Each structure stands twice: as C-alpha cells, then as structure tokens.
Amino acid sequence: MASYSMGDLKKGLKIEIDGIPFKIVEYQHVKPGKGPAFVRIKIKSFIDGKVLEKTFHAGDKCEAPNLEDKTMQYLYDDGENCQFMDTQTYEQVAISDDDVGEAKKWMLDGMMVDVLFHNGKAIGVEVPQVVELKIIETAPNFKGDTQGSNKKPATLETGAVVQIPFHVLEGEVIRVDTVRGEYIERANK
C-alpha cells in the first residue's frame, strides 16, 4: 500500500489513519518563526462523517486507503437504504441512508453517482459537483421584489431547499452546486 509524507498532503487527497479512510477537506502549511514547519489538516471520515484536525511534521507518514470508486445508478430509497446498481454487471448494492449522508438530497432515481468502496464494502456516495434539478415549489414574484434581499427559498424535486433569485420561477430546471448547496444558473433545456 502506498504511503504519503507531509509534502504529499493536499486538499481532496484520500488517506487512511488507524484503518479508517478520510478525505482532506482543509490543508494549511505552517512555518513558525521558531522550529520546523508542519502541516495542519482537517479530515472527514468516510465511515461516520466526523471531521477531525490532525498535525503532520516532517517525517510523519500516512497510508493511502484501499478505496475504489465505482460509477453506479441510483435506483430508489426503500426507507432505510438507498439501492444502487452497477449498469454493467447488474449487481445491486444497498447503502444505509446514514452512509449516503448529504448526497441523498441531490440524488434522483436513475442518476449516475460514484459509490465508494473500502476493502470491498460500500461506505459512501459522491454525487456530481453540479446537478440539474426542477423547482417544485417557490414563492410567487411580486412587483418590487427586487428591493433588499434578492433571493427566495425554493424546494427542488429531491426535497432539497436552496436560495434562488426572484426571477427564477416554479417549474424551471436549475443547476445546483452540490458542494456548497447553492444555485448556479438556469439549466439550458
């Protein structure tokens, strides 16, 4: 298994600490006035979603996790688990709603997503960074709405709620950034 030294660490890298796979979500190289440089990182567990802070000094090493990404089709949610299918082998995998986490609010039936496997066990889901979803409910526009705050809440077809500009109407399809949970633009449909 490959290992990473302090200089290899960067945001987005996947590492393993004490047998648990993590993703680096924040990276900071610190060079104090006195003493050796070190790296401070925030890591998010793929298993339980907890965020931890770790410090690495020169010479410290961490392992690369045994992770595999597989593109699969999201089929449905049975109330406890989300069901996914490998479109080439037709093998189905169930992942608990807790393990799917925040990704669930951006997933539509039939959507292709990346399912993450650790040592052969499905542990999480990564949706595309940008998805197109239909607005099913939002407040109507009134004359003078452009004064002050120029955003209104909108419920999307997955149940997620995002803030959208007043000129966007119910029934329109919009592009949403799934990382920040924000409206990007109207979709070209």
Swiss-Prot record:
Entry's localization field: Cytoplasm
Pathway the protein takes part in: Protein biosynthesis; polypeptide chain elongation
Coarse class of the protein's main subcellular location: cytoplasm
Gene3D superfamilies: 2.30.30.30, Nucleic acid-binding proteins (2.40.50.140)
Entry keyword annotation includes Protein biosynthesis: yes
GO molecular function: translation elongation factor activity
InterPro entries: Elong-fact-P_C (IPR015365), NA-bd_OB-fold (IPR012340), Rib_uL2_dom2 (IPR014722), Transl_elong_fac_P/YeiP (IPR020599), Transl_elong_KOW-like (IPR013185), Transl_elong_P/YeiP_cen (IPR001059), Transl_elongation_fac_P (IPR011768), Translation_prot_SH3-like_sf (IPR008991)
UniProt GO BP: peptide biosynthetic process
Keywords: Cytoplasm, Elongation factor, Protein biosynthesis
GO cellular component terms attached to this protein's record: cytoplasm
Task performed by this protein: Involved in peptide bond synthesis. Stimulates efficient translation and peptide-bond synthesis on native or reconstituted 70S ribosomes in vitro. Probably functions indirectly by altering the affinity of the ribosome for aminoacyl-tRNA, thus increasing their reactivity as acceptors for peptidyl transferase.
Sequence similarity: Belongs to the elongation factor P family.
PANTHER family according to UniProt: ELONGATION FACTOR P (PTHR30053), ELONGATION FACTOR P (EF-P) FAMILY PROTEIN (PTHR30053:SF12)
Name of the featured protein: Elongation factor P
The species this protein was found in: Campylobacter jejuni subsp. jejuni serotype O:2 (strain ATCC 700819 / NCTC 11168)
